Amino acid sequence: MKKAILYLNQFFGQVGGEDKADYEPEIINGQVGAAMMLNGVLEGAEVTHTIICGDNFMGTYKDEAVSRIMGFLEDKEFDIFLAGPAFQAGRYGVACGEICKVVKEKYNVPVVTSMHVENPGVQMFKKDMYVMIGGNNAGRMRQDMSAMAKVANKIIAGEKIGPADEEGFFPRGKRHQHWREDGKPASERVVDMLLKKLSGEEFQTELPIPKSDRVEIAAPIKDLSKATIAVVTTGGIVPVDNPDRIQSASATRWGMYDVTGLERLEGGVYKTIHAGFDPAAADADPNVIVPLDALRAYEKEGKIGKVHEYFYSTVGTGTTEAEAARMAKEIVVKLKQGGVDGVIMTSTUGTCTRCGATMVKEIERAGFPIVQMCNLIPVASTVGANKIVPTISIPYPLGDPSTSKEQQWKLRYHRVGTALDALTVDVQEQTIFKVKI
């Protein structure tokens, strides 16, 4: 009997929900939570261990989390490693991809995971492993787990894995020599394809070329002291009554909120409606996501000309790239009308960061220098944000509530200052700016 190990997050490992998203890595003998379902559909293998780690812990302390999990595996024998399914949960998808990639590289064992097409982990890891095409929520658990097991069973049995479209995983960009059953030569196939194209019929290319959507880096701000700076967020900060009825996930709406005369955003007046993380910290102090207080300080010091009268907000969790791009284009109109010179984008969880980076590209495409502040740097980088400043966490990007107000302020002030400086820097390639606090 072969041995398998499964990685799960805190939810599917039955530890808890968002309140346990900081759960530290743990390895358990046998099957827990979703691992029991996997064990029931594996053939010729048994899930001997279940690894559980909170999504926020993996996202915020990735190196430590990976190191500890690698330590768990040092004395374990296993023939295959699986993770998920992650559905459309961005943090979970990125975590599954990260740990599978390291396990594959270190232990030279096959790895399998599953994600929805809109999960940012797909673009990040589909070339490195079998990423099964999954559903968008846990209602697809049984189907997605069975699909993972189907490929795993073939691997365990030493059977040949077929093409991506037949097996149900995302194409990995690998080409193999294949003998067609019909024996039709390339010369005939290309003529058939051309005739279909000329007659307007559907046809399938044998060599898909991936499209690159990198945006030219906008010209930097020359004089920050005269510039108007706006904040856009995918972190869901809105007035407490949510006047624009922005959805808490898979958003199709956005809002613009007047901050004229406000020194900071007060809890109880503003809140987050974002369903992708524990809202407690952001509800208590919305400035940890929309750093109005820090921007006002820089405005008074003369570092920037002024803060734009409005901030713009939507929810990024589960939001499709198409909707993100559309909303960004609509916001661009308002930015132009408001005479904005530069933009700071703040983002939180995985799909939220993917949504934010997609919006960043559209805003930069319109000519605005823009920087994305986020915790999940690999997601922003993969999607194509050109200027990135790290934040400290998913639920509270710019202020850890477990620290003093003074410490939170110093961190927020410093990192927002770094973002403002980034708007003035002329870079020729994607750049992650270093922070000191």
Swiss-Prot record:
Could you name the domain of life of the organism this protein comes from?
Answer: Bacteria
Q: What is its EC number?
A: 1.21.4.4
Keywords of this entry:
Oxidoreductase, Selenocysteine
Q: Which reaction does it catalyse?
A: acetyl phosphate + trimethylamine + [thioredoxin]-disulfide + H2O = glycine betaine + [thioredoxin]-dithiol + phosphate + H(+)
The answer to whether UniProt assigns keyword Oxidoreductase to this entry is yes
Care to name a GO molecular-function term for this sequence? betaine reductase activity
Q: Where is the active site?
A: 349
Output the InterPro entries linked to this UniProt entry: Betaine_reductase_B_beta, Various_sel_PB
Subunit info here reads: Heterotetramer of two alpha and two beta subunits. Component of the betaine reductase complex, together with components A and C. PB is substrate specific.
Give the family this protein belongs to, as stated in its UniProt record.
Belongs to the GrdB/GrdF/GrdH family.
What function is annotated for this protein? In the first step of betaine reductase, the substrate is bound to component PB via a Schiff base intermediate. Then the PB-activated substrate is nucleophilically attacked by the selenol anion of component PA to transform it to a carboxymethylated selenoether and the respective amine. By action of component PC, acetyl phosphate is formed, leaving component PA in its oxidized state. Finally component PA becomes reduced by the thioredoxin system to start a new catalytic cycle of reductive deamination.
Name of the protein in question: Betaine reductase complex component B subunit beta
Species of origin:
Peptoclostridium acidaminophilum (Eubacterium acidaminophilum)
Organism lineage reads as:
Bacteria, Bacillati, Bacillota, Clostridia, Peptostreptococcales
Which gene name belongs to this protein?
Answer: grdH
